[in-house]
Regions:
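Catalytic nucleophile loop
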Residues: 103-143
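Accessory alpha-helical/coil subdomains and C-terminal extensions
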Residues: 192-236, 244
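A short, Lys/Arg-enriched amphipathic alpha-helix from helix-turn-helix/homeodomain DNA-binding modules
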Residues: 220-246, 252-255, 276-295
Length: 341
């Protein structure tokens, strides 16, 4: 590790977002110099030694075709104070384990040597593949909840977290969705350069936090599971009949299965219990109505299947992290006021 400036390494690959990689690089590289220049016209010097590395150090194109010229290969880096595994996008229906496994040995060795290990978005999957999140909580994009449950059950995904400090000495830190790299950058700056430097950087780059977390942005995964035809038929039915009374019993009857067998197979196919799946669909539909209409909340609750508006509000807050009225104010596409809260 460097004696003068903390060494920060950004690990990127072909599925990394340019916004994450270059956003992190620009913000971290600016620490110690840009704020002084902007506010005092005084020269400064970079406080952090920031480098981009890849699996082989060769020039490549990241997600979207943007060229990346790494400073080095990951194996050229034997020591660093902190490394960031940038997002490495994977379709939720795929299995990225082979792609991620090439980084595992280096990540484990870096952690064993004392480096802080952090990730952004799907970068947490890379850490999980290396076994570094076993027995720990983690943040990642909300859409990867089922993938974590299926491929990495030893890790616990906190779907609403923006930053998750997952090791008691804070040497493993994971960040949620793609733009949560901003929170991670400020955390890194505060950790290595102090709170004042982090605040100065936030002012220069106009960075602010995701105060609502991820839940308001989360959407239900509607993918039909083709491997279980019975459950697929039930998914197709509930997609059109989510507001029906007693929908779980209706799906059970449609399946022709005993209740416990149906619940077990539904959970296995979708990653959710039948009632959780129904509630997620109903709240997703309610979100779209709040975004696009001025209908009163009471009317929306009834339209998606809740006759008790209070129960609807409780469920909405549980799944979305906010109230229907606050969600409408933040996300309404029409800019119209609600006719009842």
């Amino acid at each position: 590790m460097t004696a003068s400036r903390p060494a920060i390494v950004l690990l990127a690959g072909e599925s990394t977002s340019a916004a994450v990689l270059y956003g992190l690089y620009d913000v971290l590289f600016s620490v110690g110099a840009v704020y002084l220049d902007m506010t005092m016209g005084a020269p400064g010097s970079e406080a952090l030694d920031v480098r981009i590395v890849s699996k082989d150090g060769k020039t490549f194109r990241c997600f979207g075709g943007i060229p990346v010229e790494p400073h080095a290969s990951m194996t050229d880096v034997s020591d660093c104070d902190l490394l960031v595994v940038c997002d490495m996008y994977s379709p939720i229906s795929g299995s990225p384990r082979a792609e991620y496994a090439v980084y595992s040995d280096w990540l484990r060795q870096s952690y064993a040597r004392g480096s802080m290990v952090t990730s952004v978005c799907s970068g947490a999957l890379v850490l999980a593949e290396a076994g570094l999140l076993n027995g720990r909580e983690t943040a990642s994009h909300w859409a990867y909840a089922e993938l974590f449950a299926k491929d990495y059950p030893a890790a616990t995904l906190r779907r609403d977290s923006i930053l998750c400090l997952t090791e008691e000495k804070d040497r493993i830190v994971t960040a949620g969705g793609v733009t949560s790299w901003q929170e991670l950058a400020l955390y890194i700056i505060a950790r290595f350069c102090g709170t004042e430097a982090a605040l100065q950087t936030a002012k220069v780059h106009l960075l602010s936090g995701h105060e609502l977390g991820q839940l308001p942005f989360a959407a239900v995964n509607r993918r039909i599971e083709p491997s279980d035809g019975v459950i697929a038929r039930c998914q197709e039915w509930i997609a059109l009949n989510y507001a029906a009374p007693n929908p779980v019993q209706a799906m059970t009857d449609l399946s022709g299965l005993p209740s416990r067998t149906f619940s077990r197979r539904f959970q296995s196919a979708t990653g959710r219990s039948p009632i959780d799946y129904v509630q997620a669909l109903r709240i997703e539909e309610a979100k779209q109505m709040l975004e696009t209409s001025a209908d009163p909340v009471v009317a929306i609750s009834a339209e998606v299947g809740y006759q008790d508006a209070a129960a609807f509000r409780r469920t909405f807050r549980k799944l979305s992290g906010t109230t229907p009225a606050d969600y409408r104010r933040r996300f309404s596409r029409l800019g119209v006021g609600a006719q009842g809260n």
